[in-house]
């Protein structure tokens, strides 16, 4: 139990340092051209232990080469935070991914088959330290805020919606210019 709490505090400290560096503009992003499919697969691979422990699968279709210019490691971090959120609210289910590109932006969607977001939580989901009413017990309310800041620094946006029927959906847009 103590080891678990120490790990949690260490993760909190690390996340706060990253947010601080993002706020101050001192986090250097090493942008390179990478394929969207690669980003999603690498993010999923980094979560494999957690996915296996919760019996959660990830569906990532290979839709042909779609390049984005991002910092691979930090973009993976943002995507992993979204996937973790889906996993925590739909253990044993499937996390779905889809993506498409047009001349203005690349859109990446990540969604689950859970209950979706509560209406009263929607305006606050990306605020630091906000924990929704159905928040995972061990969460600290940093993951979605961190994902938003990482994407914003790369000319991106993120929004959360509820899928028709059931499930929470994150929509990322990474603009070309």
Protein language model annotation of sequence segments:
Residues 4-9:
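Short alpha-helical segment of the dimerization/phosphotransfer core of two-component systems
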Residues 36-40:
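Hydrophobic helix/adjacent strand patch within the catalytic HATPase_c
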Residues 117-130:
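Short conserved segment of the HATPase_c
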Residues 30-35, 52, 57-67:
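Conserved catalytic submotifs in the C-terminal HATPase_c
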Residues 85-87:
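Short helix-loop "hinge" at the ATP-lid/N-box region of the Bergerat-fold HATPase_c
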Residues 94-104:
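Short beta-strand/loop element within the Bergerat-fold HATPase_c
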Residues 93, 156-157:
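Conserved glycine-rich
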């Amino acid at each position: 139990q103590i080891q678990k709490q120490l790990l949690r505090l260490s993760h909190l400290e690390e996340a706060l340092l990253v947010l601080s560096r993002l706020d101050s503009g001192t986090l250097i992003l090493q942008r390179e051209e990478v394929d969207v499919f690669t980003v999603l697969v690498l993010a999923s691979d980094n979560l494999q232990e957690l996915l296996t422990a919760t019996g959660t699968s990830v569906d990532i279709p290979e839709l042909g080469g779609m390049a984005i210019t991002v910092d691979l490691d930090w973009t993976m971090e943002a995507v992993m935070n979204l996937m973790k959120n889906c996993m925590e609210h739909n253990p044993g289910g499937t996390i779905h991914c889809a993506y498409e590109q047009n001349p203005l932006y690349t859109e990446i969607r990540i969604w689950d088959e859970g209950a979706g977001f509560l209406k009263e939580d929607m305006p606050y989901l990306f605020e630091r330290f906000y924990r929704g009413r159905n928040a995972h017990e061990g969460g600290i309310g940093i993951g979605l805020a961190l994902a938003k800041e990482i994407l914003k620094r790369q000319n991106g946006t993120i929004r959360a919606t509820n899928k028709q029927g059931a499930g929470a959906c994150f929509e990322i847009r990474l603009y070309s210019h």
